[in-house]
Amino acid sequence: MACEETGMGRFEDKVLKKRVAIEKTPGPEFFTTHAVSGDNGLVLEEMAPFGVIASICPSTNPVASVINNTICMIAGGNAVVFAPHPGAAKCTHRTVEIVMKSLRESGAPDGLISSLQHVSLDAMNELMTSPNVNLISATGGPGVVRAALQSGKPAIGAGPGNPPVVVDETADVEQAAIDIITGASFDNNLQCIAKFVDRKSVV
């Protein structure tokens, strides 16, 4: 559905992305209490929920983003309101419906996760500035991330980023080449982490 609506990506890779999001996203097991003792006494570190999180979704990775964010955010005791990208609204809404149905069947309250039904830049901005929102998580282009970071609220921004690959003398060069090409072409390179190789490689 995401490939059809957005016109981007590769179906087989999107299936794998969803599976990885379901199986590898940290859940409640990640949130443990730690005690640190030293010369100055004992410190107890315990994570606490923010409350309601506004999650701004991208068009490049809409379904896996909803799955990933739902798991880690509700595991932390939060509720989530998703703001779909206009180019991926149908698949984002459908994913939220499916995940909320599963949560409801597991005993979660209605509305633990939801999505904006009216999708627009104004609606997204209204969500981010709502007094009911305690944290913003924005995945998208520089403009969206900038808006989240300048909202005056705690925000996590994930914009485009292309990390370099360092292939040094300890590498299996043939395998490194295969892995670099596979990673850079995965889902037609939509995940904003495509690699490039510096010509000044030490190999």
What are these regions (language model features)?
Residues 1-43:
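N-terminal Rossmann-like NAD(P)+-binding subdomain of aldehyde/semialdehyde dehydrogenases
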Residues 28-101, 106, 142, 151-155, ...:
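Conserved small-residue-rich beta-alpha loop and adjacent elements
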Residues 31-45, 113-133:
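A structured beta-alpha segment of the ubiquitous adenosine-cofactor-binding alpha/beta core
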